[in-house]
């Protein structure tokens, strides 16, 4: 029997016209949007799934990085956006958004993925303007249009 996350993922794949996508044996489904944004979905349990945006590796040589990350995390949470978190295996900064599975539609999933993508863009640009660069093979500052963001935006 398929979980609610699996059924939603099937409907989402059909909606966006990509055939089939599925969770792997670790209950993760990862994909790249526009060859820039690396997104992972986690089938955590039958109540919610997690949407992760992989922002890049922690820059260990910038003393302001930790303060900027704390500031960004507070800003995102105050505005209903994703949490910032650390993934130790890849030594990377992630944006994580909890997505409840009650009354879900593929459109709602798409909207929440967009919230994570917009938050990734904004975080990347604000950090870049502070002289902080996250090492990320997918996301390049030149590929994201900017109006010199100086403040965080939760993407909603």
Swiss-Prot record:
Cellular component GO terms held in the UniProt record: cytoplasm
Family annotation (InterPro entries): Tir_chaperone
Family label: Belongs to the CesT/SycH chaperone family.
Entries under Pfam families matching the protein: CesT (PF05932)
Protein task: Chaperone for the type III secretion of Tir. Probably stabilizes the protein, prevents inappropriate protein-proteininteractions and aids in secretion.
Cellular localization per UniProt: Cytoplasm
S-S pairs: none
Organism the protein comes from: Citrobacter freundii
Keywords, sorted A to Z: Chaperone, Cytoplasm, Virulence
Biological process terms in GO annotation: protein secretion by the type III secretion system
This protein's name: Tir chaperone
């Amino acid at each position: 029997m398929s979980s609610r996350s699996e059924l939603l993922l099937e409907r989402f794949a059909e909606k966006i016209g990509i055939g089939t996508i599925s969770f792997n044996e670790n209950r993760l489904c990862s994909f790249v949007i526009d060859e820039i944004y690396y997104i992972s979905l986690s089938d955590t349990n039958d109540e919610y799934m997690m949407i992760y945006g992989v922002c890049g590796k922690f820059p260990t040589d910038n003393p302001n990085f930790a303060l900027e990350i704390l500031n960004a995390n507070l800003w995102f949470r105050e505005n209903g956006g994703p949490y910032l978190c650390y993934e130790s295996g890849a030594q990377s900064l992630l944006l994580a958004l909890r997505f409840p599975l009650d009354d879900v539609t593929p459109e709602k999933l798409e909207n929440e993925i967009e919230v994570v993508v917009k938050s990734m863009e904004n975080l990347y640009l604000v950090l870049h303007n502070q002289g902080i660069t996250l090492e990320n093979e997918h996301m390049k500052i030149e590929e994201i249009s900017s109006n010199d963001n100086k403040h965080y935006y939760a993407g909603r």
